[in-house]
């Protein structure tokens, strides 16, 4: 199974640089995983695709303004992207500069926002730099940080992104990328789901910048996933078990919710979980908990389109993406969405199992 099997041609004009004026105004491509049938809908139609007794599981992570600009003591420009807050004053970060900062060197950050914040580079962890700040990291980011828009959105962040690159139900700060399927839900739609008898549950997965990193292998099975923090509380486990017992479906909102639930189900049955996951889901994976999912359209040759292919089958997914391009759906973080049901006989490229 090759990474190149997951390539598709996407015109730049279909990459959404801004969200729709209203959260629910996006289009929704409904893919029946079993048959491969595609129906073109509007996002509020998700109400017609769920049933009383279903459980929708959302990721309640909050995107932190993790991108900070500044300079080295030498005066050279520097840009940091905090990947993970380790403790109050320390973080692991990607650092972009003409020359990488040396150990013990200082960075002066936040001048573009009228701040003067110092951080010291005390070591490295792989590609990440270990930084110690002179004040709490989250305080620094709230004052001096910019929303970390994905690299394919080719514009500076704007004030509106502070709201629109967050879900309305975010609770726990820690992500450096939004769980984008959730961006389509507003309070009114959540209330309508509740009124229909659909239960909701919340997991936490702090999305890392690694989600945008291109795969650097040719063979899919050689790829090693980056680790991300996940939390599935005992109450969520009970909700999942109750939904299954009453014949309801577990519907994951976003690939991060899928990865959270499946990470907590590796023993064969879902159990509480708190810690890192590096689960990599691609065709051949046997889903243990998730029955349907809501997701945006993903990058060619990405781990996320592989996850969707594992869920609904490679041929069905690639055919659906082809139709989405033909119908000019909007792609990626601020784009349109899919509602996908699971195909128990899903296969990979060339019928691989």
Curated annotation (Swiss-Prot):
It holds the Pfam family Queuosine_synth. The gene is queA. Transmembrane segments: none annotated. InterPro entries: QueA, QueA_dom1, QueA_dom2, QueA_sf. One of its GO terms (cellular component) is cytoplasm. It is found in: Cytoplasm. The keyword Lyase does not apply. The keyword Cell division does not apply. Pathway: tRNA modification; tRNA-queuosine biosynthesis. Monomer. This is S-adenosylmethionine:tRNA ribosyltransferase-isomerase. Coiled coil: none annotated. Its main location: cytoplasm. Keywords: Cytoplasm, Queuosine biosynthesis, S-adenosyl-L-methionine, Transferase. It comes from Marinomonas sp. (strain MWYL1). Its EC number is 2.4.99.17. It is an enzyme of class 2 (transferase). The lineage of its organism: Bacteria, Pseudomonadati, Pseudomonadota, Gammaproteobacteria, Oceanospirillales. It comes from the Bacteria. GO terms for molecular function: S-adenosylmethionine:tRNA ribosyltransferase-isomerase activity. Transfers and isomerizes the ribose moiety from AdoMet to the 7-aminomethyl group of 7-deazaguanine (preQ1-tRNA) to give epoxyqueuosine (oQ-tRNA). GO terms for biological process: queuosine biosynthetic process; tRNA wobble guanine modification.
């Amino acid at each position: 199974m090759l990474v190149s099997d997951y390539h598709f041609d996407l015109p730049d004009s279909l990459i959404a640089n801004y969200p729709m004026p209203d959260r629910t105004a996006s289009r929704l491509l409904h893919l029946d995983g079993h048959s491969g049938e595609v129906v073109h809908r509007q996002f509020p139609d998700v109400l017609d695709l769920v049933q009383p007794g279903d459980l929708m599981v959302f990721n309640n992570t909050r995107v932190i303004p993790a991108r900070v600009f500044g300079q080295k003591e030498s005066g050279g420009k520097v840009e940091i992207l905090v990947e993970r807050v380790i403790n109050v004053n320390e973080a692991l970060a990607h650092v972009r500069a003409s020359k990488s900062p040396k150990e013990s060197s200082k960075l002066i950050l936040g001048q573009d926002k009228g701040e003067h914040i110092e951080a010291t580079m005390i070591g490295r962890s792989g590609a990440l730099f270990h930084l110690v700040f002179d004040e709490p990291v989250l305080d620094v980011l709230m004052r001096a940080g910019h929303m970390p828009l994905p690299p394919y959105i080719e514009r500076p962040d704007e004030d509106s992104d502070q709201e629109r690159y967050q879900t309305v139900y975010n609770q726990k700060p820690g992500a450096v990328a939004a769980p984008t399927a959730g961006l389509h839900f507003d309070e009114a739609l959540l209330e309508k789901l509740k009124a229909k008898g659909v239960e909701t549950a919340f997991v936490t997965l702090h999305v890392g910048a690694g989600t945008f990193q291109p795969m650097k292998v040719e063979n899919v099975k050689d790829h090693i996933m980056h680790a991300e923090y996940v939390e599935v509380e005992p109450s969520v486990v009970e909700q999942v078990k109750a939904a299954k017992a009453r014949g309801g479906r577990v519907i994951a909102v976003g690939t991060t919710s899928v990865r959270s639930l499946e990470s907590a189900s590796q023993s064969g049955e879902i159990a509480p979980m708190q810690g890192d996951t590096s689960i990599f889901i691609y065709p051949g994976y046997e889903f243990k908990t998730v029955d349907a999912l809501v997701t945006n359209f993903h990058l060619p040759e990405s781990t996320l389109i592989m996850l969707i292919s594992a869920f609904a089958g490679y041929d069905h997914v690639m055919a659906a993406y082809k139709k989405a391009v033909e119908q000019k759906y909007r792609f990626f973080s601020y784009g349109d969405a899919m509602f996908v049901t699971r195909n128990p006989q899903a296969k990979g490229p060339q019928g691989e199992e």
